[in-house]
Amino acid sequence: MSRVSQARNLGKYFLLIDNMLVVLGFFVVFPLISIRFVDQMGWAALMVGIALGLRQFIQQGLGIFGGAIADRFGAKPMIVTGMLMRAAGFATMGIAHEPWLLWFSCFLSGLGGTLFDPPRSALVVKLIRPEQRGRFFSLLMMQDSAGAVTGALLGSWLLQYDFRLVCATGAVLFVLCAAFNAWLLPAWKLSTVKIPVREGMGRVMADKRFVTYVLTLAGYYMLAVQVMLMLPIMVNDIAGSPSAVKWMYAIEACLSLTLLYPIARWSEKRFRLEHRLMAGLLLMSLSMLPVGLVGNLQQLFTLICTFYIGSVIAEPARETLSASLADARARGSYMGFSRLGLAIGGAIGYIGGGWLFDMGKALQQPELPWMMLGVIGIMTFLALGWQFSHKRTPRGMLEPGA
């Protein structure tokens, strides 16, 4: 086996272990934020939505800067620093009793993510061969789902005792992850050439096709982020207990572990990437429309199942598509900018979703936020269809198996 092949194989295992620690640390804390501050402390959903939206926007909106700096200086220092900063954010969240302190903790958490997320994504593109990326992204998503339900279960159990224990556990996991990277991650460069920060960012901004694709995905993310805000609140309201939230993540884990990899393997040779992304988005959008009208957990979990199946179809295609469109000369910058759609869509989804949720309750129209989200998803579906029409997309780039 050549040294390059050996490095790729070892790199795969490193990425999987690193990803599991990050997912566990994140999901121990974040799914329970809305439960803690809205249901237990009585804050308005808008206040919590601002905090979650701020974290999302800081982490993803500034990702191009984190990616460009990583292109210049390498992945390791950025990843280690970012993970320690997120640990500090979680520790601060544990003592948050005023909205400003929650916002500050989410700001720290988001800034840490700005530093470690783009170089980690770029390492996947660097280490995984193009023909294997779709399946590897599926494996990462399966791991994400298993880690999410494990983290949510652990966090829900700890929440019975003290929210500070929840945050301390998340902080410790990110400190461990920082140590793991500091110890084992080689000083790899992310791009094929060492370019100045400004040049890497300039390459991305000049790629109009990539920029349009990323910005269009903002509507997709407005729906996706509700698994952290409105869906947990909805489950808690109907069930009358925050412990029911863990079953929502258990559903996601079961569907991902059983369906994600088989669907990715079956569809990658039969359908174009953009068609898989659009099909999943349409299913997610249609499942959102009736959520506000349900009256029991069985109906709600059925819609959540449909939403997750849509995500299982869409997510591997979205990740693979983003990676395939990236310029190898500025991988970090491209993968950082690819998070801008999540920054915009996530911030609007959290803040706008929280505001609409409060407004729907005040007007006694609980279906209002869900109808709006469904409409936004359908509009995004149509926008992607226009962008990926044959007149705009060169044939071959996004073909099955390309």
Curated annotation (Swiss-Prot):
Membrane topology summary: Multi-pass membrane protein
Sample GO molecular function, one term: transmembrane transporter activity
TM regions (residue ranges): 13-33, 45-65, 99-116, 139-159, 165-185, 214-234, 244-264, 277-297, 300-322, 340-360, 368-388
Location(s) in or outside the cell: Cell inner membrane
Keywords of the record: Cell inner membrane, Cell membrane, Membrane, Transmembrane, Transmembrane helix, Transport
Pfam families, sorted: MFS_1
Transmembrane as UniProt keyword: yes
Record carries keyword Transmembrane helix: yes
Gene Ontology annotations for the cellular component aspect, listed alphabetically: plasma membrane
Stored PROSITE patterns: MFS
Record-stated family: Belongs to the major facilitator superfamily. DHA1 family. MdtH (TC 2.A.1.2.21) subfamily.
Protein name: Multidrug resistance protein MdtH
Organism listed in the record: Citrobacter koseri (strain ATCC BAA-895 / CDC 4225-83 / SGSC4696)
Gene this chain is encoded by: mdtH
